[in-house]
Amino acid sequence: MSNPDIGRSCMLVNAAEMLKKAEAGHYALGAFNTNNLEWTLAVLQAAEEAKSPLILQCTAGAAKWMGGFKVCADMVKAAVEATGVTVPVALHLDHGSYEDCFKCIEAGFTSIMYDGSHEETFQINLDRTKELVELAHSKGISIEAEVGGIGGVEDGVASNGELADPAECKQIADLGVDFLACGIGNIHGVYPADWAGLSFERLSEIKAEVGDLPLVLHGGTGIPEDQIKKDQRQHRPAARLRQGRSRLHRGRQGPPGQGLRPPQAPQGRPRQHRRSRQGAHGGVRFRQQGLIAWLQTCFKA
């Protein structure tokens, strides 16, 4: 008799369990931002085809554009069910404020990130992280924290970037967070020509303090592939490699020949709305192919 669970669509899960498996299997997980239904479908279908666990994430700004956190959560849940994906999928808040975290827990997200790196003092970051860890875990939700501001601009919030303090990373880790983002020279968005690269020395110091806690590499779209692989291989075997939405949407990242810019809508159609639908479908498939290449090149599931 066949197993009734084979081929059955999975429900959303929190990210903690898939990160534990990644740690044990010495591979990284991909986290991809979504801004709309088309991008959500492309990411889900790519993860299914690549048989890769997936963290699908949304910023507060993107959620506002889509109608709010509840609309975003319901859309993702419906897309997971409609596509019938069987790989584990977590819905994660990306760079959330203290207030955003409460809203996402209420909306049905299965994972949250509290970015306390922009608070006035580290103590505020510490206190609020502690509170949110207790709340999230009581709801079965995983939580990511951040120490040391990641450079560049993310969802309208700018940071000069800094190397995280290993001692502060340990204090946050000891609160029981499920994964930790720490600045090691990485930047959101476009990397400048004089970028010094990742500080693997600082990363080693942080790992020595936090042990087996999975670490997160933000700004992954601009980091050269050799540094990504070195980051995974030497220091961050269960890292959640974040592929930021801005560079992906420009079609400038991914393996050679695997840009993510969708093709133009078919020409010569008598009705404009038909061209729009055809173009949207082609865009989903084109993005999906580029994402599969990323997953197969940089990740193992």
Predicted features along the sequence, with ranges:
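N-terminal amphipathic/basic-hydrophobic helices that include classical n-h-c signal peptides
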Residues: M1-C10, L291, L295-A301
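N-terminal amphipathic alpha-helix/helix-capping segment at the start of soluble metabolic enzymes
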Residues: N3-G30, K77
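Alpha/beta enzyme core
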Residues: V13-K21, N36-A62, G67-T86, H95-L213, ...
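Conserved phosphate/anionic-ligand binding catalytic regions in large, soluble enzymes, centered on
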Residues: F32, N36, R242
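Glycine-rich beta-strand-to-loop/alpha-helix junction loops that act as flexible
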Residues: L217-T221
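C-terminal alpha-helical cap/extension of soluble enzyme domains
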Residues: E225-F299
